[in-house]
Amino acid sequence: VVTMTSYAPLLAKEGHTQWNPDLIYFNNTEVKPTVGYYAQQMYGQNAGSEYIASSVTLDNAQDAVKKRIGVSVVRDGKTGDMIVKLVNLLPVAVNAQVELLSLEGMNTTAVKTVLAGKPTDQQVRPVSGTMEVSEKFGYELPAYSFTVIRINKNEK
């Protein structure tokens, strides 16, 4: 289990770098987080502390497709939230059926955050919204994307 990550170099002044990628660029007037920064931020804010068994069925069962789709479902021990993370490394969207064991005590409206764009895109930013979820729900993973679906625990 990975609890921390280290990214080097973290900061780099534009025009004064030895290699690419760096995590955050800056110049004399602005700070420019990279796409990698946002991906690390999304993982860090949604790490979870307990793995939850789940299954995902794809509309395409080819091995080449399955190897490029990543899924993780965890629970945040502090908040009780369930966190579904989906990665699509393919250049096309993929339809998935997500099956969770139980949503008992959870809201059916979740917060979805998506980071999507071509691998060469440098201006991609996470986009958040809401979506309805159930114990079994369909979701279209955009091409080249990382999606976090955070299902909040019901407040009593």
PLM feature spans:
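Aromatic/acidic polysaccharide-binding cleft in carbohydrate-active enzymes
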Residues: 1-71
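Hydrophobic, well-ordered secondary-structure elements that form the walls
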Residues: 5, 40, 84, 98, ...
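Composition- and surface-driven signal marking solvent-exposed, interaction-prone regions
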Residues: 19-26, 86-87, 95-101, 111-113
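Acidic, Ser/Thr/Pro-rich beta/coil linker or hinge segments at domain junctions
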Residues: 103-143
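Flexible loop/turn segments at secondary-structure boundaries
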Residues: 11-16, 91-94, 119-122, 156
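Carbohydrate-binding surface patches
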Residues: 66-106
